[in-house]
């Protein structure tokens, strides 16, 4: 791994640990609805520390027209940070349960209101989907990668049925998002940051 990549990893991990810990502390003092702006700034700073730049093309529908299901292609470890920096509203997410066990990151996900899903246990997966339904009932939007996992090739994987079932069942609009360049920056199977 080139020296510059090692430097970027060290810088981004230290930045994440500091800002993640600060975010968790501040999240105890302010209501979750006000965390979105802080999260956007923190994610952008971590991405900058990793040598990444985020540029938004296009626009989102007004939050007042929601709730929405924001769906994005998942090709990189950086995707979640990228998406948070551009989303116009506080949005919950659904993610594999293993993410919630990662120190600091798992705590941030829980505080953010993310919902863990265990795809290996049907009853738990159904309960997670029911929790998403309650989010929609409360007017909250959802962020999800319909592929269910990161692509190892940079190409789209087949979509899972769950996100579309949620959209139809709850009559929620789908907002597609395309992330470009993240696969080239840090893809699954490589630890090199570019």
Short names for language-model regions:
Residues 19-37, 48-50, 62-122:
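Catalytic core of membrane glycerolipid acyltransferases/transacylases, capturing the structured
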Residues 67-69, 141-145:
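Residue-level preference for the first positions of well-ordered beta-strands
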Residues 104-106, 140-143, 152-194:
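A cross-family acyltransferase "interaction/gating" segment
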Residues 122-125, 156:
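A conditional alpha-helix N-cap/helix-loop micro-motif detector
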């Amino acid at each position: 791994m080139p020296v510059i990549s090692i430097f970027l990893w060290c810088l981004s991990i230290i930045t994440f640990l500091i800002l993640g810990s600060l975010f968790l502390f501040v999240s105890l003092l302010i209501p979750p609805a006000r965390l979105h702006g802080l999260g956007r700034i923190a994610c952008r700073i971590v991405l900058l520390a990793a040598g990444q730049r985020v540029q938004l093309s296009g626009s989102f529908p007004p939050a007042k027209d929601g709730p929405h299901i924001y769906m994005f292609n998942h090709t990189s470890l950086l995707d979640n940070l990228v998406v948070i920096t551009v989303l116009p509203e506080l949005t919950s997410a659904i993610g594999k349960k293993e993410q919630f066990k990662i120190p600091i990151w798992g705590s941030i996900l829980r505080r953010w209101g993310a919902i863990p899903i265990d795809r290996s246990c049907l009853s738990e997966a159904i309960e997670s989907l029911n929790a998403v339904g309650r989010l929609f009932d409360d007017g909250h939007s959802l962020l999800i990668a319909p592929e269910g996992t990161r692509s190892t090739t940079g190409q789209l994987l087949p979509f899972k049925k769950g996100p579309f079932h949620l959209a139809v069942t709850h009559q929620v609009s789908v907002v597609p998002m395309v992330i470009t360049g993240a696969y080239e920056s840090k893809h699954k199977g490589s630890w090199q940051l570019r």
